[in-house]
Amino acid sequence: MGKKSMSGRKMTFLLITIPIVALFFCFNTLPLIKGVIYSFTNFKGYGSFDWVGLRNYQDLFTDSRVGGSYLFTFKLAIVATIVTNVISLILALGLNSKIKFKSVFRGAYFIPNVLGALVVGYIFNYFFTYILPAFGEILGSKPLSSSMLSSTKMAWIAVVIVCAWQSIAMNTIIYISGLQTVPEDVYEAGAIDGATGWNKFRHLTFPLIIPFFSINMVLCVKNFLMVFDQIMALTKGGPAQSTESISYLIYNNGMSGGQFGFQSANAVIFFIVIVVISVMQLTITGKKEEQL
C-alpha cells in the first residue's frame, strides 16, 4: 500500500507539472529558440527570408541608433537604481521605527506598485505636459514652464522619476522585511558600545541586511534595463530618440520597422548582457556578505 501510495503521489505531481512545463515551453522557451534562429536571417516579420549568418550581430556594433539606446538604457538603469534604493532604504528605516499608523503608511507606499506601469506613465505624462508647466508659469520659472518630455536634455529625468516612483514601493517592503530580521540584541550591544546614528546603521544594520540589498539591486538593474512601458507612455523614445531604450527599439523596429531579424539579434545580445550583469552583481554582493 505504501509503494502504491507513493507512486500515486508521484503520478499526481507529474500530471500537475506536465501542463506547466508545456505552457512554459510553448510561450517562453520556444519563442526564445525561434528568436535566436531569426537572428541569423534577414526576416522582416513577414514573407520569406534568407540566412545571413553573423551579419546582424556585426551590424549591431556599427549601428549608431543601437549604441545610443544602450547608452541611454544603462544611464537610466544606473541613476534609477541609485535613486530607488536610497529613497527606499530611508523610507524603510522610517517605517520600521516606532511611529504611529505605520501599517497605514506601509499600505499607502505600496499603492504605486499595484498600479500598471502604462497607467502610471500616462498619468505622469499628463502631469509633465500640463500641470507642471502651469506651476512653472505661476512661479515664473522658465525651465518648468515647458514640458520636460519635449526636451532632449530633460526627458530622461522624467523617465527616471516615473520608474523610481513605481519601484520604490516593492523595494521598501523588501528592506522592511530585512530590517525586521535584525535582532534587538544587536542594537542593545551597539548602544553599550556607543553606536548611534550613522555608525549604528553602517556597522550594525546594513551588514545584516546585505542579502536584501542584493535582491533589490539585482531586481532594480534588471527591471530598469528592460524598461518599456514607461517609455511607451511618456515619450515613445523621443524627442529625437533621446529616450529610446533597448526594449523599445527592439519592439518598435522589430515589429513595425521591418528589422525583425536584426532586432532578434539585438534581443539575444541584450539577454546575454542582462544575465552577465546579474551574475556579476550576485557574485560581488556574495563576496561582500562573506567579508562581513
Walk through the language-model features, giving the residues of each.
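A structural signal for multi-pass alpha-helical bundles of membrane permease subunits
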Residues: 3-292
